[in-house]
């Protein structure tokens, strides 16, 4: 049951000049990062987390969530005016946004994207508030067996949905698990793979890894393909009429549901949500032949869904400790940095955590709406900044942010090393999110597996006799078998022979 008094208390707790300024700062930075092709929301969040060290956790979450929401929306700017999606989530927006801009309706397209992004985030935030306590109740029945399988399920889901192939995704995920074993064993106190280096006693700095994998790797990749400054089209800002917004409302509600549900599926992401919603609307439209030629319904479907995906992705992150996408994988690192352990026991640390997240999402959405409407022309100017200047700024922030956490030059070396690793992974087709998930969930998987074995006298039987554990195990086996091309071909051949 929703506690209205807790919602009111959560609202009053953020009504200070400092926190409202953090909302503005995070949203503004997010929209700018999202608008610049080549700079991702994941990179922005990973850089930001290091600068939240020393803040109160509520202030840090305000900054992070604001940047996440602003960044997801910001990708529509370059998608509409340049036909270059600022983020993968805005790729579907470009299909109809850019043709509208070519007709001189770029401002209208941007206005539609702004209002629909706001609607999608608000609608999904309400679903987040309703669904989260239900999943928490389920999570309270978890034991060591379920936690271990949940960690493995998250890694396998991410490997399946973010990599070119399941095998490559699993290689990346298990590499992350191997990296997570470096340091002192939390149970026995034995040093593992430290090679006498005291800086490795606690393993690698998670912030250094995140900034290296997502920030430095992106810088290296971008330096390999530098392009001239972008020149956005000029377009007058035109707000959609009330009649137009009411016409789009049914599409927006349906797309919000698609985005929220898709976001709650671990490893899927806003880009998938946008494409699924776009395809549904194209099929339901009375004029599907106009999609891709400047039909505003395409923008409504894509932008509502990809922004609704943001609150949706927080559901598995907070309730089960499994990231909904690459950005929430990084956000988990930020929560851990501030002493919050995502998962079923999170409410024991902070009983009102879901109400506070709900309020932060709502307020961040309002700031996104205001910034999107009033700073349209400024963000168009940002697109013209030379990419070399942006990359220099990102590099400096990466070094400063990494060093600031522990004041160790060793962490800078780790950041650079993982930046090179991240770049090489891109070149061979290995996805970064499974690696990051492996590192984040590695400790949880290892400790709970060992506890499960000890408590069951080293018997594997509880994995199949406990209902939730059995369900997770069946899901894992299904994913692995479903992606095995050899077995799939044999199954189809067997069915054909029987037919």
Predicted regions and their residues:
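Transmembrane alpha-helix interface/packing and boundary motifs in multi-pass membrane proteins
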Residues: 27-41, 70-83, 158-163, 256-266, ...
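A structural-propensity feature for long, helix-poor, extended segments
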Residues: 68-79, 86, 295-320, 324, ...
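Membrane-interface alpha-helices at helix entry/exit sites of multi-pass transporters
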Residues: 58-62, 99-116, 286-298, 326-329, ...
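Helix-loop-helix hairpins and the membrane-proximal interhelical loops
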Residues: 1-60, 140, 191-295, 380, ...
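Membrane-embedded alpha-helical modules
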Residues: 111-228, 337-492
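Membrane-embedded alpha-helical segments of transport systems
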Residues: 69-74, 115-127, 135, 179, ...
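Re-entrant/interfacial helical elements at transmembrane boundaries that shape
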Residues: 41-51, 79-99, 130, 173-174, ...
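Short helix-coil transition sites and intra-membrane helix breaks within transmembrane domains
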Residues: 32-42, 80-90, 124-127, 262-272, ...
